[in-house]
Amino acid sequence: MRAVVQRVDGASVVVEGENGPETVGEINGEGLCVLVGVTHDDTEEKAAQLARKLWSVRMLADEKSCSDIDAPLLVISQFTLYGDARKGRRPTWNAAAPGDVAEPLVDEVVARLRALGATVATGRFGAQMRVSLTNDGPFTVLIEN
């Protein structure tokens, strides 16, 4: 699994609904915006490890973690994190897990975070999303497991 983790001061995800734009996930104030990519050999245990790391990583102000101050997380699936653009002009997605593999693992990350006590908002798996955030720092970290 691969996660791009950004310290934010608020973030939201909007998708196009039947009646226009619909906000499907939002966090207010200090927290983390997490883009999660899944590859073929990822497992529920890797999802659990990632959740524990996200809950405890000290990326917030004063070297605090989300668990220290009950800061929220916005978790968004993003298969393009496993894109490969080394050859040619068009990325390939061979390393990205298909949706039927990836979706339950992203859901597992969210479920594990919530089980740890986290407040978690999410995007909508497979949807075209507009993500808005106020990057704080900026402070961005890549986590792989």
Swiss-Prot record:
Q: Does the keyword Hydrolase apply?
A: yes
Q: Which UniProt keywords apply?
A: Cytoplasm, Hydrolase, RNA-binding, tRNA-binding
Signal peptide as annotated in the record: none
From the Swiss-Prot or TrEMBL record, what is one GO molecular function term?
Ser(Gly)-tRNA(Ala) hydrolase activity
Cellular localisation: Cytoplasm
Supply the SUPFAM superfamilies for this chain.
DTD-like
Task: State the span of motif (Gly-cisPro motif, important for rejection of L-amino acids).
Answer: 137-138
* Subunit and interaction comment: Homodimer.
What the record says about family reads: Belongs to the DTD family.
> According to its UniProt entry, what is the function of this protein?
An aminoacyl-tRNA editing enzyme that deacylates mischarged D-aminoacyl-tRNAs. Also deacylates mischarged glycyl-tRNA(Ala), protecting cells against glycine mischarging by AlaRS. Acts via tRNA-based rather than protein-based catalysis; rejects L-amino acids rather than detecting D-amino acids in the active site. By recycling D-aminoacyl-tRNA to D-amino acids and free tRNA molecules, this enzyme counteracts the toxicity associated with the formation of D-aminoacyl-tRNA entities in vivo and helps enforce protein L-homochirality.
Matching entries from PANTHER family are given as: D-AMINOACYL-TRNA DEACYLASE 1, D-TYROSYL-TRNA TYR DEACYLASE
Please state what the annotation says regarding this protein's domains: A Gly-cisPro motif from one monomer fits into the active site of the other monomer to allow specific chiral rejection of L-amino acids.
Q: What is this protein called?
A: D-aminoacyl-tRNA deacylase
GN (gene name): dtd
